[in-house]
Amino acid sequence: MRDDNTRNTIIFFVCAALLLVLYQVFVIGPADKRRQAELARQAPPAAAAQAGQAGAPAAPQVPQAMTRQAAVAATPRVKIDTPMLTGSLSLRGARIDDLYLDRFRQTVEKDSPPVELLRPEGAQYPWFAEVGWVGANVPGLPDSGAVWTLAQGSTLAPGQPVVLTYANGQGLTFTRRIEVDDRYLFTITDTVANTTGQPVTIAPYGTVQRQGVPADLGKNQIVHEGAIGWLDGKLRQVKYGKWRKEGGGPAYNSTGGWLGITDKYWLAALIPGQQEAVTGQFRRTQAPGVDVLDANFVGAPVTIPAGRQVSETTRFFAGAKQVPILRDYEQSLGVAHFDNAVDWGNFWFLTRPIFQFLEFIHRYIGTFGLAILALTVVVRLIFFPLANKQYESITKMKKVQPQMEELRKKYKDDPAKQQQELLALYQREKVNPLAGCLPLLLQIPVFYALYKVLTVTIEMRHAPFMGWIQDLSARDPTTIWNLFGLIPWDPASAPLIGAFLNGPLHLGVLPILYGFTMWLTMAMSPPAGDPIQQKIFQLMPIIFTFIMAPFAVGLLIYWTWSNVLTLLQQYVIMRRFKVDNPIDQIIRKLTGKPKPAG
């Protein structure tokens, strides 16, 4: 039995190490290479539209980058002012390209500036939305360089729409009415009047475009960042790395749907009419020195008879991926699966219920930290019957430990006989040495799902808990190297070793508490019979303390509290079976009480 245990332990750690290596080689490594590779391929120019057909306009040539303020000031603008958004839209191209999210800050500091969402072309890393019309052999359609006239309104605000006009001088007059609600949705209604004296065929289009990708995006493998949309009845996603390297993939014929570009917490997405036939596509082209990424759709061609006009309505979402708001738009506007803009992942059947539970509890207690504690209790209750059997088996193992040691000593020269006698002892005492594995394995998907929820949902970003914890989605900000802030010194500033102290060796309060509760939990279990196993198990709390240190505080709260509940359950069972345990030993040392007889 000892040899089997040793072999199983070694196999476990070898497999775990192999999985980590494979993940590094086939996931992390290629992703890093894609980010670091120099993009030298030049995308072929878009093919000219055939007679009677329309396609998305070609990507523009990107001008040399200027400051954001200079890029905003370079074009005439209309101010945008809502309870959640501020910025402006450009009259050149009638683009929505300058937005800040006023209710979200870049850091947890009170004086931190608001999050910047969209930025105009000409600045570094522009990100904007544009809608309009395309058509073959139709001269004078307004493009990105067309300057519109503000015909009505002065500031775009809820209940205060603006109207823009553009006359191409060739018989077509374009009128654009733009509305915005008190959250994140713009409604754009385009009307085209035909006074050319002959029918004109054009098609509506829309594009969300990003030129270049900031270096801090696309590095988290668990989070989808890049192209996203619901087209042809399916969720379509292309990560930035693949998008830049391989292009965006095929065109999708769809009825309605939505598409755009997403980051971890933010989304810019176009929503065409939900009953209209559209062709959506994620496209990559190149301008000098930069990738041009755009998510675009083209609607069905519309023929406007002479003397008539047509109208087309497109909506544009630009804001934080707050699940209740996404669901409200999904229900009120009929936007299919709009809450899938949040990356629920392959374990969506766990991540969604976990988020809904946390959201429900949060409404009543006001903090997601306490909601995580409540979630932990619920998970423990679900696994209670199984865990109870596990801890009873562990307690029995600890109780028969002296007999096991005697058998090992008695038959140390006869491994076969030793194993036979140990198996007989397990059967006689109704002990299962493997009973402790199953509950832990069953909790791993829950742990991963909670990790996903904490990572991708905006509700967890900058969510405080207590004391020093101001962001449940970030690592513990304290560090042992300055005594958790008691010493006014930043370990990251230390010469040569600062990067290590602030990186792999960063240890905060919660990781240390987690490691201590893990050590105490393992101390409550019977010691391994093999010396190698004993050393491995002694090192595991230390190893996992460092492994867990970079994880989100919310995860550490969950796992540490789970360890505490495990200890309480295990302690009660051990007291019931009258088995001595480390907690009683610590209490006796602190109080000076003798060990009870028997």
From Swiss-Prot:
One of its GO terms (molecular function) is membrane insertase activity. It comes from the Bacteria. One of its GO terms (cellular component) is plasma membrane. InterPro entries: Membr_insert_YidC (IPR019998), Membr_insert_YidC_N (IPR028053), YidC/ALB3/OXA1/COX18 (IPR001708), YidC/Oxa/ALB_C (IPR028055), YidC_ALB_C (IPR047196), YidC_periplasmic_sf (IPR038221). Pfam families: 60KD_IMP, YidC_periplas. It is found in: Cell inner membrane. Coiled coil: none annotated. Keywords: Cell inner membrane, Cell membrane, Chaperone, Membrane, Protein transport, Transmembrane, Transmembrane helix, Transport. The keyword Transport applies. Its main location: membrane. GO terms for biological process: protein insertion into membrane; protein transport. The chain crosses the membrane at residues 10-30, 364-384, 434-454, 496-516, 539-559. It is a multi-pass membrane protein. The keyword ATP-binding does not apply. Required for the insertion and/or proper folding and/or complex formation of integral membrane proteins into the membrane. Involved in integration of membrane proteins that insert both dependently and independently of the Sec translocase complex, as well as at least some lipoproteins. Aids folding of multispanning membrane proteins. Interacts with the Sec translocase complex via SecD. Specifically interacts with transmembrane segments of nascent integral membrane proteins during membrane integration. Belongs to the OXA1/ALB3/YidC family. Type 1 subfamily. This is Membrane protein insertase YidC. It comes from Phenylobacterium zucineum (strain HLK1).
